């Protein structure tokens, strides 16, 4: 029964993680700081509901650190998504997410108990496949982002007035008033920066559970700590809300009280936050019923596959025989690697 519950939680978590940015992607979302702050309020509301269903267990301040890690990584999600698409973004950061989570458990980083795999060769072989799959993901060249909202004059700063001129060899690019056209080299630089940022974000995501695992591994230090994963959800989500609020305050100060904060983003961001809150709670349930060694590789990689399906069939971020062939091969290799890592333990 516990296996069925764990696998069901993995499935729910993967679908929600892989689909949560779809509502936001359809809107012009700026730099994503406002989006994340609205998401964090919805996440906190979900956390309050979970907290009440668990009988208001003891609050664990250390678990807030995991929420901070996630919020720092997620602060880059919208710019990444707007540059290389939700599918490629999630697949790339899912790779380092999986590797970071593997390293923390395998070597006992940050004071948690190390987990020695029963089949070391299979474990390392799976890790190599995950890394190689991540390399293949980086070779995919997504289409230039195109949304109607991004072209709307209402969404453009006064200094960025646009004309109807069109680049002769790239009809998708609107030419600024001065006539300058983004060069291919410039687009490649943005793409490379987005990939590097995705890799760094994945590391933050990979360490999200470390504080909770540390508490669970040291009952002598935390004798009254919750016994189940859901007992840490509220503490975890408070960390997210506080970090997102700090980033929002810093952004308001930096922009001199002129942040990008469109009212059109409130509904989609609340939806994304609610989906993430439920998905993360499901991940805690999966950890309790399957162990993190099994659930982590699944939930760190499958959402990227689901997001890639959105990119291919809905947003059309990824098209062309070369890209689709690379995507299919990379997904297959990465999933096989993640399965090997999970089975080896």
Curated annotation (Swiss-Prot):
Q: Where in the cell is it found?
A: Membrane
Transmembrane stretches, start-end: 3-23, 32-52, 61-81, 84-104, 120-140, 193-213, 233-253, 265-285, 293-313, 324-344
For whether the record's keyword set contains Membrane, the answer is yes
Q: What is its main location?
A: membrane
* GO annotations of cellular component type: membrane
The UniProt entry lists membrane topology as: Multi-pass membrane protein
Keywords in alphabetical order: Membrane, Transmembrane, Transmembrane helix
- Per the UniProt entry, the signal peptide is none
Q: Which GO terms describe its molecular function?
A: carbohydrate transmembrane transporter activity
Show the InterPro entries listed in the entry: Sugar_transport, TMEM144
Q: Specify whether Chaperone is a keyword of the entry.
A: no
Family to which the UniProt record says this protein belongs:
Belongs to the TMEM144 family.
Record-linked PANTHER family: TRANSMEMBRANE PROTEIN 144
Which protein are we looking at? Answer: Transmembrane protein 144 homolog
């Amino acid at each position: 029964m516990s296996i069925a519950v764990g696998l069901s939680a993995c499935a729910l978590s993967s679908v929600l993680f892989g689909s949560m940015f779809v509502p936001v992607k359809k809107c012009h979302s700026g730099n994503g700081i406002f989006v994340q702050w609205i998401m964090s309020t919805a996440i906190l509301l979900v956390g309050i509901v979970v907290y009440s269903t668990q009988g208001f267990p003891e609050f664990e301040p250390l678990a807030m650190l995991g929420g901070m890690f996630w919020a720092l990584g997620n602060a880059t999600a919208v710019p990444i998504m707007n540059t290389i698409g939700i599918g490629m973004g999630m697949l790339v950061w899912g790779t380092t997410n999986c590797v970071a989570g593997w390293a923390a458990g395998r070597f006992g980083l940050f004071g948690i108990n190390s987990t020695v795999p029963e089949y070391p060769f299979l474990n390392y072989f799976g890790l190599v496949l995950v890394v190689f799959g991540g390399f293949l993901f980086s070779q995919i060249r997504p289409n230039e982002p195109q949304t109607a909202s991004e072209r709307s004059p209402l969404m453009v700063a006064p200094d960025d007035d646009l004309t109807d001129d069109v680049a002769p060899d790239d009809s998708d690019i609107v030419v600024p008033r001065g006539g300058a056209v983004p060069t291919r080299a410039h687009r490649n630089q943005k793409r490379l920066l987005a990939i590097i940022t995705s890799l760094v974000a994945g590391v933050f995501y990979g360490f999200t559970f470390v504080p909770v695992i540390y508490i669970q591994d040291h009952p002598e230090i935390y004798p009254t700590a919750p016994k189940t994963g859901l007992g840490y959800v509220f503490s975890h989500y408070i960390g997210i809300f506080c970090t997102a609020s700090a980033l929002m305050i810093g952004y308001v100060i930096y922009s001199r009280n002129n942040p990008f904060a469109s009212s059109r983003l409130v509904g989609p961001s609340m939806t994304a936050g609610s989906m993430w809150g439920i998905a993360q709670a499901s991940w805690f349930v999966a950890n309790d019923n399957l162990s993190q060694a099994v659930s982590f590789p699944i939930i760190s990689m499958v959402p990227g596959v689901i997001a890639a399906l959105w990119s291919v069939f809905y947003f059309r971020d990824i098209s062309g025989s070369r890209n689709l062939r690379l995507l299919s091969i990379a997904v297959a290799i990465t999933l096989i690697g993640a399965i090997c890592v999970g089975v080896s333990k």
